[in-house]
Regions:
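Conserved PLP-enzyme active-site core in the AAT-like
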Residues: 8, 22-35, 39-187
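Conserved N-terminal alpha-helix of the aminotransferase class I/II PLP-enzyme fold
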Residues: 1-25
Length: 187
């Protein structure tokens, strides 16, 4: 009952409580979705658990999205040109020319919705720009999880998006123990 209640509160179709934090949740999602050779759009801000789950355990092939760095070396958001379809298809073609020609060349995009350093993406923008190229998008919201409860952040919440029939499946991982009131590495 508590998972159903949480799904309702967070505006999710389903909610699963996972122990061992978002590291475990990221591996659950990536290992459920990916097989060897699948192309994955990969945000450089992603947590190591995604690299372990998606790239090592599942054997998927990364297509890295470049990120900005400030003068102090902090990684910022994904560079704007990385949301261009022609550019992404070109990157896909470098790894798998046949998949690059498919309507959805990427099995999964993994986006660090909010970074350790404070970058918070507009989820609507991400889905509108790359969603049609992906079967699924995993938004790792480990450092937030509160965006759906703050009106001015509603566009940052993948859980509040009105999705169309052509949009990808959406997964959101949250670290309830970081920014919310969860116990011991609850995700």
């Amino acid at each position: 009952d508590s998972q159903d209640f949480a799904a309702k509160v967070f505006h999710a179709d389903k909610t699963y409580f996972v122990l061992n934090g978002s590291s475990a949740s990221n591996r659950v999602v990536t290992n459920a979705l990916l097989t060897p050779g699948d192309l994955v759009l990969y945000d450089r801000n992603n947590h190591k658990s995604v690299a372990i789950g998606a790239l090592i355990q599942a054997g998927a092939t990364p297509v890295y999205l470049e990120t900005a760095r400030n003068p102090y070396g902090f990684i910022g958001g994904i560079d704007a040109h990385c949301f261009d379809e022609m550019y992404l298809r070109q990157l896909a073609a470098e790894r798998d020319p046949e998949k690059a020609k498919q309507p959805r060349p990427f099995r999964l995009a993994v986006i660090q919705l909010d970074t350790y350093d404070g970058t918070l993406y507009n989820a609507r923008y991400v889905v509108d720009r790359i969603g049609h190229l992906c079967d699924y998008i995993l938004f790792d919201s480990a450092w937030a999880g509160y965006e759906q409860f703050i009106p001015m952040l509603k566009d940052s919440s993948p859980l509040l998006l009105d999705l169309g029939k052509d949009d990808p499946g959406i997964f959101v991982v949250q670290s309830v123990h970081k920014q919310q009131a969860g116990f011991s590495q609850t995700s």
